[in-house]
């Protein structure tokens, strides 16, 4: 495989491109290499060879080092600690952080050769949520050091105005449902769940991370477009009762590898029949972005750049609170509602 380069008898150096940046992963055993290959295949993290785009820092120092079957270092006593999403605990002294995830350990900013180091709790099942969570945290930390900042959001582009639209929210907020409805209505799409933000001069761009969409049975049942194209039984089962599918095989609309967001919807399920949309001030929009990006404060080595990107995103966009009602289970209603805020 072209992404793998031998470093030592048991170590492989793997080079990837993501959101126009290069990241090097050092897998220190064969199982770790297989994990990276299989999990990265589900994201827009593409194997490549060494290129002229690689800086001296990137080529000489891996962004991630991962291994199994090796005892992790002891977490220093007395460090500050806090709970993180997914059931883990982060320990930090302000410069170095350790994330404990069910016995697996992710070290960020440890003064060794890799920016992020991973010790898995044995050879976990490759498709297990536990292992995916470990690799996700490691990748997000490494990408922050490449000035790419993760955001839980769907992303689409209005076919008439060309505006990039982000549908932001945690799991269970309705962002995947609305993203699917808009893609079914002919809006170009990037992702329904996780994206990366980057600064290109004064402009902020959004890039998709996860390749597949994931929906609930309720969303599928309410979407005539999806039901005419596929059976729920043929979609791969996911945690929390969701099913995933490849959007390029489902929608007639076009996939885009990035967009410039100009409209932000912070989605939450309201349970009412009709949705409500409330305009947010720039300060309220920034506060909500920070709540959705806790590592903009937790990871001090990247906090200044992270907050600067969020601030630039606020300046180029308009933010809204979306109290999602049952009416968004209808494709036409969803498209008309969002279009009323993205078109003059």
Report residues per predicted region:
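Post-Walker A alpha-helix
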Residues: 178-179
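Active-site flanking residues adjacent to catalytic metal/cofactor-binding acidic residues
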Residues: 192
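A noncatalytic interaction/capping subdomain that flanks phosphate/NTP-handling catalytic cores
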Residues: 1-171, 184-185, 195-344
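Residue-level detector of anion-binding/catalytic polar loops
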Residues: 188
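Conserved lysine of the Walker
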Residues: 175
């Amino acid at each position: 495989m072209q992404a793998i380069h031998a470093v030592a008898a048991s170590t492989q150096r793997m080079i990837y491109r993501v959101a126009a940046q290069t990241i090097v992963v050092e897998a220190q055993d064969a199982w770790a290499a297989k994990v990276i290959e299989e999990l990265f295949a589900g994201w827009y993290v593409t194997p490549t060879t060494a290129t002229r785009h690689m800086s001296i820092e990137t080529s000489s120092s891996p962004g991630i080092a991962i291994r199994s079957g090796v005892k992790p270092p002891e977490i220093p006593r007395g460090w500050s600690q806090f709970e993180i999403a997914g059931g883990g605990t982060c320990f930090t002294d302000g410069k170095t952080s350790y994330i404990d995830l069910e016995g697996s350990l992710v070290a960020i900013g440890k003064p060794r050769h890799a920016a992020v180091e991973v010790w898995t709790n044995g050879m976990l099942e490759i498709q297990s949520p536990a292992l995916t969570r470990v690799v996700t945290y490691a990748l997000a930390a490494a990408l922050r050091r490449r000035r790419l900042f993760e955001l839980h959001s769907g992303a689409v582009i209005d076919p008439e105005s060309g505006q990039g639209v982000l549908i932001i929210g945690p799991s269970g907020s309705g962002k995947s449902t609305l993203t699917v409805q808009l893609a079914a209505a002919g809006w170009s799409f990037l992702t329904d769940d996780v994206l990366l933000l980057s600064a290109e001069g004064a402009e902020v761009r959004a890039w998709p991370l996860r390749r597949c969409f994931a929906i609930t049975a309720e969303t599928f049942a309410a979407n005539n477009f999806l039901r005419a194209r596929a059976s729920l039984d043929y979609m791969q089962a996911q945690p929390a009762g969701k099913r995933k599918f490849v959007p390029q095989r489902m929608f007639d609309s076009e996939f885009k590898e990035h967009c410039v967001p100009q409209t932000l919807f912070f989605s939450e399920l309201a349970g009412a029949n009709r949705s409500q949309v409330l305009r947010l001030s720039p300060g309220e929009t920034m506060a909500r972005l920070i709540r959705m990006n806790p590592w903009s404060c937790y990871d001090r080595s990247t906090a200044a750049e992270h907050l600067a990107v969020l601030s630039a995103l606020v300046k180029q966009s308009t933010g809204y609170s979306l109290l999602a009602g049952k009416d968004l289970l209808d494709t036409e209603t969803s498209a008309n509602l969002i279009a009323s805020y993205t078109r003059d």
